């Protein structure tokens, strides 16, 4: 394992001067030490590329070898590496995040209030939102926050993603759903989620973990597709969100229909843009399976990598979900970029565009404000 951070293009202007005289320009750029207090800059032009790389059942078996192998396959360093931290493990993934940061990538952590056996469609478990709101898990939250603070480097954290679906135990359908609350003029399911989200963020910030940027991460379309369950109902407010995130999946199972990128992104993207006029948007998960009789995966990937940067200008990062699994009917869902030669070639070609940034842009933070 490397002992020094390997940021290939992390030199960014912390103090740049630009003078123009006729056709002459002079730019002075000061080097940024990634081991010092820094923050990740949202790119004005282009977008970061990233991946989740099939890190095991609990999505946390991060290794440098897996990251480097993936980068060799796709032909570009990854600016963002995603992994999970399930509450059932009751720990903070310090070792994983060190591997990612020392490799020169930004950790994206899905912090999920989920207990073993980590199966979907089972309903709430011991980490239910009501207990979180009541403070039952404050000791764990505080310890996690302390470890995040002590990690000391930037990371993005998602608390309870895809809450507008019906598959995770924190989904709004389990917490009152469409029951109307006259006092708040809102629905009980989303209100309970927002209360839990704010409680968690407040406690983490209260422990001094200012190196965390928070992402509000929804599924592109809501299930059920009812007004009460639309993403805006769950939005905890601009003070609690730094990034807006979307999951965008094409066909994952053999009996699902094929769908192109505009049909998956157009309306959800506009919905996110209306939530906040300025916050950056991330395609926090995107992938499709290899189903040649349904549609061409290579063309789907090509379309995604083109349109994310041209049709949707507020998208500033996209994280591919590189995973393969076997279903109960013995069929496979192969979302990996190299599920076929055509798929891999499309991904490599799209990622080769310089607008897809494989290296982080960093800005130094004065030590007085980095505490």
Please name every model-derived segment.
Residues 33-36, 61-70, 90-98, 142-143, ...:
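Alpha-helical scaffolding within the catalytic cores
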Residues 96-212, 335, 365-369:
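Substrate-binding cleft of extracellular glycoside hydrolase catalytic domains
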Residues 95-112, 240-292:
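Glycoside hydrolase catalytic-domain groove-lining segments
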Residues 81, 157, 242-244, 318:
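Conserved, mostly hydrophobic/aromatic
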Residues 160, 197-229, 278-291, 319-323:
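Aromatic-lined carbohydrate-recognition surfaces of secreted/lumenal glycan-active proteins
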Residues 38-57, 155, 280-371:
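Substrate-binding cleft of secreted/luminal carbohydrate-active enzymes
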Residues 37-139, 288-291, 319-320:
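N-terminal substrate-binding region of glycoside hydrolase catalytic domains
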Residues 20-22:
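C-terminal motif of bacterial Sec signal peptides marking the signal peptidase cleavage site
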